[in-house]
Amino acid sequence: KNLVEPPWHCPDEYLNLPIHMRQFEMELLTPKAADNGEVVLQLHGGGYIAKIRNAYRDFAVRYSKIDQYRVLSVDYRVAPQHPYPAAFQDAIEAYRWLLYSGFSGDRIILAGDSAGGGLVLALAMYLRDQSMPLPKKLVMMSPWTDLTASGPSYQENYENDPLFGNTRESMIYNGEYAGKQDPKLPYISPLFGDFRGLPPMLFQVGSLEMLLSDSVLAAQKAKEAGCDVTLTVYQDMFHVFQLSMDKLAESRAAWDEVAAF
């Protein structure tokens, strides 16, 4: 939580512009060469208790390199100082900022991992509920869609998950984000929401994860609601294994799948 990192080095072919919002910060990564006119809105992971870190700036570069995207990364407010709905409100405000900046919904891709993946889904549901322009696609890596920890994989993978397994002390049980709210509220746990009318979505998840069912059950509900859904379970992989970038074959395959999607 209190990790102090060295300054991030922005690759020479990019500009990374800080954007100061009223209650949070954002960073807009832009290729110096011509961009493709579309933007990835990145919502980072960290259990709603960790701020953005350099790994997600590297993620932004990786997203951009797929096809010269601009990438807006949101350093949203986090618990316990700022429980729900702070992060959710910041995600909405970031999306509105893109709309006001001239991006139509069909030129915006939502992408997130872990808590950020759940936030992607919650944001899409909110936009649909408010009849706002919907994004083009949703990309979710190991999304945390069920803050009640009720899915079967929380038990089945309890001893298999190298990150969250064998303990009840991990961030997936701390409850700080939901605070005094019902964790089954769809904007907190989008697994319990209405999936009708949502954009095409990609779920990637590792077979060893306690959060496996967060993706499997959400994808199932989305398909039943008529959504265009791709779910890929990567065998013997752990939570957000895509952080390995090119070091793991499975991570390379996952990033290739994101590019193809």
Where do the protein language model's features map onto the residues?
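N-terminal targeting or regulatory segments adjacent to alpha/beta-hydrolase or S9 domains
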Residues: K1-E5
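Alpha/beta-hydrolase superfamily serine-hydrolase fold, recognizing
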Residues: C10, L15-F261
